[in-house]
Amino acid sequence: SFNRIMEEILSPARKIVGETLVPGERAPAERALVLAALSEGDSKISNVPVVAGRMVELLRELGVGIDKKKSTYSVKGVGLRGFKGVDEPIDLDGLGDTALLLLTLLAGQGFTARVKLGGEVERCQGLIDLLGKLGFEIQRETESAFVLGGSKAKGCVFEEVDIEAEFKLGVMVGALYAEGKTVLSETASNRNRMERFLRGRGVEVERRKEGQGYMVSVDGGQVVRALDVEVAGQLALSYPLIGAALCRKGSKLTVKRVAIRAGQRAFLDLLRQIGAEIDIEDLGEGEHDLHVRPSELKSTRVAGQRTEKVIDHVALLAVLATQAAGEIVIRDIEALRQGAFDYVGHLFESLRSLDARVGEFPEGIVVKGGTPMMAGRLDAKGDPGLVMAFAVVGLLAEGGSNLSHTCLQCPFKT
């Protein structure tokens, strides 16, 4: 497992060879669990991250049978209307876009439910308005609490064009609860990702050209069929393994089925720009295998917008810089000094304690590569970025380094 690999690399290793998966992305995992719950039949959802456990418990409370074996969940679907009412308010706060799908699901039930949206109110309001046009009654009780369910929905033609993707999935699922046909208007042919989630589960979603745009229609009353899903890995969790493989001669690592999304790949691109041999194999649907070979990283200066895009990976970049040919300067990270502790100062002191050649200045650090790091004891202060960076130190340092087990768990709970 990924946890086990992270523990192993705390001791020096000569090379990293093999294939691995990293924990799946939270939102796609939760979406797959909800769609499995409202399907007819049994689904297996694999590579589910620990953080999706709250969603699993919520679905169980609504009467869905879910068994777990390692990171794979077996879900006994209850169909569109087979969920069980609960007496207590259902808390959707903090669930992000998955709250949208649950809101639709609950609105379509025969029973009345109370939901607490908390900080999700503003995000959900757009979908609440759209569901209202289908006839779903969603009444506001307080600023962030709503009552819904028990209403009869009817298909309609939406005037809105190019409804946001996550709203669109909510509306299309809502259309399954409605009587008649629901029609959406779109301007582009490639806005069909959410449609594929339903088509893959046996739902007929018609898309036809009309004038300069497209009409997407869904008939109510269709059955959603079970579908097994393997959740793609979270790119950020692959970086420690990639970094370790880059710096150890003889390594040959493949990270399987990683999701690479626009706007989230800046650190991957930076590594390749400074000489990292990382081949990206496109598997389709935004999923990729990453093939990693040992590489000599080159000098670079990271500043301004470039820094902003990789700010979450500064610690790992600094660790990898100790193995580079030349000097890597990381500027414009003074904001990291303002949190619960001086992140930059702590990173500098930690690397210096390992005999790394590192310098500190008010807005950043500079690291000179080519000098072996000595073993030491590291405190990641519960920060996920430091945990993963210091785990890589454990592989690269002469003699290994100590990092607490509880600290090691935190990247998988964020």
Model-identified regions with their sequence ranges:
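Short, structured segments at the rim of ligand-binding sites
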Residues: F2-T414
